[in-house]
């Protein structure tokens, strides 16, 4: 993680301005030129360019602009080839009228004493002293501190949001992995082995045979009782509720702990004998149901022929 530089680290040192005098006079834009230091080489988010964009979005970029131009003015003032008149023109046009004068386009929040010094220089057509310009720069740096703290907070917030989103997706993956591995911690393998041991006797085919034989026997008994009590009951009504018996058999098969059902089928016979006494007992569709229907039809035919005789 990149370290957070101080405000001085990103403001100083500035490159020496290599523009000509004519360019300095005609320039109305801010040119923030920094020597690429450690934070620039490391592509740090804390750069002067990003700080300036942050201030510009907040409509408070005037302090940073004044700092840059005042620093350039001091560098220009060290050039002995520049005349006093030229320095005065650059100061008044690029700094005083734009950032210091009352109701200027980008008026900075200077103290009354500092403003009076510059107003006096402007009225007397004098170039301000270096010490006065340095005091103004120092004051502006104090004003920039608040904006820089907000800038650093915004960068950290963005970095935290990105990190949180990444950690959130990683946490979801961890939860998935944890839920997958938690089954083994509950001993599912042991449960599966125990369940398989119950299903060994009898096997699937043997169990199906027991169920079919039991169902067939119960069907014959049910046919007799139903023909005696309700001979007019149609086969279509028997088909409508066949799923009830099927679901009952399925629920019985889903209880491997009942070894009596799986080993001998006695428990299943008892349940079927109890269920067959109910008038609503119906057989499932398929081979058993067709066999039941054929027996009912044959029985009805026999009764009709007997009555005709």
Swiss-Prot record:
GO terms for cellular component: cytoplasm; nucleus. One of its GO terms (molecular function) is GTPase activator activity. It comes from the Eukaryota. It is found in: Cytoplasm; Nucleus. Keywords: Cytoplasm, Nucleus. SMART domains: RGS. Residues 231-252 have a biased composition (Low complexity). CDD domains: RGS (cd07440). Residues 213-264 are annotated as: Disordered. The keyword Cytoplasm applies. One of its GO terms (biological process) is adenylate cyclase-modulating G protein-coupled receptor signaling pathway. Changing residue 144 to H: Abolishes the ability to suppress glucose-induced cAMP signaling when overexpressed. The keyword Cell membrane does not apply. It holds the Pfam family RGS. Residues 213-223, 253-262 have a biased composition (Polar residues). Residues 37-161 form the RGS domain. Its main location: cytoplasm. PANTHER family: DOUBLE HIT, ISOFORM B, REGULATOR OF G PROTEIN SIGNALING. Interacts with GPA2. GTPase activating protein for GPA2. Negatively down-regulates glucose-induced cAMP signaling via GPA2. This is Regulator of G-protein signaling 2. It comes from Saccharomyces cerevisiae (strain ATCC 204508 / S288c). The gene is RGS2.
């Amino acid at each position: 993680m990149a370290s957070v530089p101080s405000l001085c680290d990103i403001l100083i040192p500035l490159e020496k301005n290599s523009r000509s005098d004519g360019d300095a006079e005609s320039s109305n834009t801010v040119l923030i030129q920094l020597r690429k230091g450690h934070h620039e080489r490391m592509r740090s988010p804390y750069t002067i360019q990003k700080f300036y964009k942050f201030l510009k979005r907040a409509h408070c970029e005037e302090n940073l602009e004044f700092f840059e131009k005042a620093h350039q003015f001091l560098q220009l003032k060290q050039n002995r080839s520049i005349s006093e008149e030229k320095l005065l023109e650059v100061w008044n046009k690029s700094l005083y009228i734009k950032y210091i004068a009352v109701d200027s386009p980008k008026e900075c929040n200077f103290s009354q004493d500092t403003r009076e010094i510059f107003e006096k220089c402007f009225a007397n057509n004098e170039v301000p002293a270096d010490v006065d310009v340095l005091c103004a720069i120092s004051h502006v740096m104090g004003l920039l501190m608040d904006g820089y703290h907000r800038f650093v907070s915004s960068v950290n917030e963005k970095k935290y949001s990105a990190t949180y989103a990444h950690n959130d997706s990683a946490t979801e993956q961890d939860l998935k992995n944890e839920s997958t591995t938690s089954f083994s911690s509950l001993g599912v393998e042991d449960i599966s082995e125990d369940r398989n041991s119950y299903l060994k006797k009898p096997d699937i085919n043997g169990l199906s045979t027991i169920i079919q034989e039991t169902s067939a026997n119960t069907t014959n008994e049910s046919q007799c009782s139903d023909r005696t009590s309700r001979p007019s009951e149609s086969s279509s009504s028997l088909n409508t509720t066949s799923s009830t018996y099927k679901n009952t058999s399925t629920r019985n098969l889903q209880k491997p702990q009942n070894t009596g059902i799986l080993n001998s089928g006695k428990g299943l016979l008892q349940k079927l004998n109890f269920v067959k006494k109910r008038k609503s007992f119906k057989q499932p569709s398929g081979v058993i149901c067709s066999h039941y229907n054929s027996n009912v039809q044959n029985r009805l035919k026999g009764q009709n022929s007997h009555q005709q005789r």
